[in-house]
């Protein structure tokens, strides 16, 4: 789903910025990889902004950038409850979830694509027999509706936020992904684009790579302070020959 930025007291503010080191990502020393979807392997921020603006305009509520910043790691249900409370809406959160799903599905079906360089990296992992998984707060219904991304082909192993007890503010989803891949979290590298998720992946014991999302929700310096590695563009990874 969407993205959230939460300033955490555990954020390593004094840590040096993670190096932009695409060469560290191939050959991959870790036994497995875990990928976020929205903002990391797919640029969907503009789709959610379109949904948010239309949703708020329908209720005569001005759009502000802090609204999407509070939603995505919450997941759909918790995000809908937050929206009802924030704007004092006399609406059922379940109805809001259905509205978001309907609006976003129409956009994801035709507009969502993988970032340039992602498929080449996934193919390299497959050829090298390195297992990997998708770990996302998005929903199966939404991702499986996409016409331009074959989610099952590219991500046969998937963990959805609704399958674990807590949001990406906690390490649950990364621990579950590692379990499904048959490795320890410490043997995984996690690719994420926002601070809260990177912190949680660290807490799970994973190596982390912050991916440049190119959207206003990302604080580049913050994610580089948290992550072990920084990736500006998937096409920068020097795959060469396997």
Q: Where are the predicted features?
A:
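Asp-based, Mg2+/Mn2+-dependent phosphohydrolase catalytic module
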Residues: 2-31, 123-126, 139-140, 144-242
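Residue-level detector of anion-binding/catalytic polar loops
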Residues: 62, 131, 207
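Hydrophobic beta-strand core positions in alpha/beta domains
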Residues: 133-134, 210
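Conserved SAM-binding loop
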Residues: 41, 135, 190-191
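N-terminal helical cap/lid subdomain that shapes the substrate entry/recognition surface
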Residues: 13-128, 152
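Residue-level marker of regulatory loop/turn positions in helix-turn-helix DNA-binding domains and
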Residues: 114, 135, 166
């Amino acid at each position: 789903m969407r993205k959230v930025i939460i300033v955490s007291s555990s954020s390593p503010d004094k840590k040096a910025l993670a190096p932009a080191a695409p060469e560290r990502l191939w050959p991959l020393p870790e036994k497995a990889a875990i990928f976020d979807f929205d903002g990391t392997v797919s640029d969907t921020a503009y789709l959610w902004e379109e949904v948010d603006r239309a949703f708020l305009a329908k209720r005569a509520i001005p759009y502000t950038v802090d609204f999407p910043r509070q939603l995505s790691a919450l997941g759909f249900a918790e995000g809908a409850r937050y929206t009802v409370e924030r704007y004092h809406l006399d609406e059922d959160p379940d109805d809001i979830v259905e509205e978001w799903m309907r609006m976003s599905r129409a956009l994801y079906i035709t507009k969502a694509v993988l970032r340039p360089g992602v498929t080449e990296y996934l193919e390299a992992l497959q050829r090298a027999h390195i297992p990997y998984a998708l770990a996302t707060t998005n929903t199966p219904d939404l991702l499986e509706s996409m016409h331009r991304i074959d989610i099952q082909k590219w991500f046969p192993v998937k963990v959805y936020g609704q399958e674990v007890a807590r949001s990406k503010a906690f390490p649950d989803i990364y621990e579950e992904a590692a379990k499904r891949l048959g490795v320890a979290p410490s043997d995984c590298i996690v690719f994420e684009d926002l601070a809260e998720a990177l912190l949680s992946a660290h807490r799970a014991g994973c190596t982390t790579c912050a991916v440049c999302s190119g959207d206003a929700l990302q604080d580049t310096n913050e994610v580089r302070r948290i992550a072990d590695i920084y990736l500006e563009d998937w096409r920068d990874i020097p795959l060469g020959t396997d």
